[in-house]
Curated annotation (Swiss-Prot):
It comes from the Bacteria. It comes from Pseudoalteromonas translucida (strain TAC 125). Its EC number is 2.1.1.182. S-adenosyl-L-methionine binds at residues 18, 20, 45, 66, 91, 112. Specifically dimethylates two adjacent adenosines (A1518 and A1519) in the loop of a conserved hairpin near the 3'-end of 16S rRNA in the 30S particle. May play a critical role in biogenesis of 30S subunits. This is Ribosomal RNA small subunit methyltransferase A.
Length: 268
């Protein structure tokens, strides 16, 4: 049996499949999720059920979103898991997570996210921040570092700003490659994301905030005078209290929000 086959299933490269099998790491992840019978739990990409099974044992029921038809069917037919799952066979990138909110009970979302689509999938999930209580995701360690990076760090970028705009983010566990089959070529880590309350998210337009980040970080080595020249003049930036000689990585989250709100108020 090759390293790509685990529990009779061949990992599919196009789905970014790497299956977690280390019991100690699985136990730590489940402890971090802390599933309870009253929780509205949602797993993205349950795969072969390594985390699904212990979570279902503690919660009694959960909803899963699985793109791979074979794996979805395998979960439906699973003698232990089948009755405890609501299986949605489909793409999490287009899934309406708000549809899973029941009796005003927010979602607790978790999963081992495919590394090849993790960033766009996170941005999709951020759109449902008001429907989510917390999230726990296995990601490439470098992605987790970028998500929690602060101003002045070389890894501080658009993902850092947008993650921290929507959520309080904390690394939980580091996971080496040998805990998976097949072993990925990168280190992994689990991150905890707790969405902020709506009143804490003060951007008047998230679309503009995201666009400011795209422009600012597109050419990281440029100063803000140049990198944001398509959006604001140097004088306009100065009027907001922004030092135009800085690079984007030196700005705080609040300064990005201030720029976005100024554009919303003055450039519409």
């Amino acid at each position: 049996m090759t390293d790509k086959v685990h529990l009779g299933h061949r990992a599919r490269k196009r789905f970014g499949q790497n299956f977690l099998f280390d019991d100690m790491i699985i136990g730590k992840i489940v402890s971090a999720i802390d599933p309870k019978p009253e929780d509205n739990l949602v797993e993205i990409g349950p795969g072969l059920g390594a985390i699904t099974e212990p979570v279902a044992e503690l919660s009694g029921h959960l909803t899963v979103v699985e793109l791979d038809k074979d794996l979805a069917q395998r979960l439906i037919e699973h003698p232990f898991l089948g009755p405890k799952l609501t299986v949605n066979q489909g793409d999490a990138m287009t899934f309406d997570f708000a549809s899973l909110v029941r009796d005003d009970k927010k979602l607790k979302v978790f999963g081992n996210l495919p590394y090849n689509i993790s960033t766009p999938l996170l941005f999709h999930l951020f759109e449902f921040a008001d429907n989510i209580e917390h999230m726990h995701f296995m990601l490439q360690k470098e992605v987790v570092k970028r998500m929690v990076a602060g101003p002045g760090s070389k890894t501080f970028g658009r993902l850092s700003v947008m993650t921290q705009y929507y959520c309080n983010a904390m690394p939980v566990i580091e996971v080496p490659p040998e805990c998976f089959k097949p072993a990925p070529k990168v280190d992994s880590a689990v991150i905890r994301l707790i969405p902020k309350k709506p009143e804490q998210r003060t951007a008047k337009s998230v679309k503009i905030l995201n666009n400011v980040c795209l422009e600012a970080f597109n050419q990281r080595r440029k100063t803000l005078r140049n990198s944001l020249s398509n959006l604001l003049t140097a004088d306009e930036l100065t009027s907001i209290g922004i030092d135009v000689t800085l690079r984007a990585e030196r700005l705080s989250l609040q300064q990005f929000i201030d720029i976005a709100n100024w554009i919303y108020d003055n450039k519409q």
